[in-house]
């Protein structure tokens, strides 16, 4: 994404998608396939689908209603975008109903113990995925698989499939969904490698509280994003913890192993994470902020263009520069006020990528855990199987998003100085990059 041609969302929508959107618009004009996003209608549909009525409280209602308002008034969704949004909201509501029903019938789920988790807290594109997937190679940690992050709650058919020795229907659903995503947005694979069974972050679980940045990545919803930034999201994190218990219960995980958590959203909601897990061990990776902003803008752009043709790269650039700046400020404030030194550890992206064994040894020393030979071998195996750029190089330019590299550097200099983060090129204001 480094040509002189101005980026346009429509150029990223494949011809079959354009034809499908055209057909759906025609159907909508005839009163068919309008994909109603009305919250009350979606709640009623979830209840009808499951035969259940208890969502486990109403903390999700305000963010869901605000989300729908932003989708209707700001996102300018195409018909496919409306369909995807409706399907996503209905899936989340359905899972909440199944989750509440499950803990009522199986109180042992809530009784499960959870050791203090290890949480990777860093900006998107700062090495958090690489770090999590390396550490998840160590069998002494619990981690999510991609399909579990989408469908964390087993529904009746899942139990039936397991009893009959058949594949979990959630796995089949995610495999089909990933194929569709990679067809519609093939460039995503170079940004964030996707696989049904790959280690994945828990932002999909936070989404079940309707308080997640995932919605921001797929639609232009600034009003919802501002609410998310400025309101406490403890309720969503509490529900995330419940879902982790459900997943562990269904897998019959040992109760003495800690979860390995990771999500860039923790930068924004570190206060909520610590409300739920006050003694979590935080691992905080840091990368050249100029690179982070450019890579983040490209990541968001490649996702958001699927569902709207009117979003502009300049809007993405300004929104995510501002968001990055605020997330950094907020996380630093929370760390200074609420996290004791023995519970936080800083590591540079450069160290993770150039000498991963040394970086990992420092992390394990901080955790007070041995970095065993078996864990090292497993980590090296993951690296050997996941060479950088195997899905294509992720290319981007700040100028594609209307951003001046010097302005980005000036606004985020406080962060670079705080952690002595090195520049990733000899010219600190070089705008074109990979990764």
Question: What kind of feature is each model-predicted range?
Answer:
Residues 273-298:
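Conserved phosphate-donor/acceptor-positioning beta-strand/loop module used by diverse small-molecule
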Residues 137-147:
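Post-Walker A helix-loop "phosphate-sensing" segment adjacent to the P-loop in P-loop NTPases
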Residues 120-138:
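Glycine-rich phosphate-binding P-loop
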Residues 253-279:
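Flexible, glycine/threonine-enriched loop-and-boundary segments that flank and lead into catalytic domains
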Residues 115-118, 256:
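Pre-Walker A (Motif I) flank of P-loop NTPase domains
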Residues 1-101, 219-238, 244, 248-251, ...:
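PAPS-dependent sulfotransferases, especially Golgi type II membrane carbohydrate sulfotransferases
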Residues 150-259:
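PAPS-dependent sulfation machinery
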Residues 101-111:
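Pre-Walker A adenine-sensing motif
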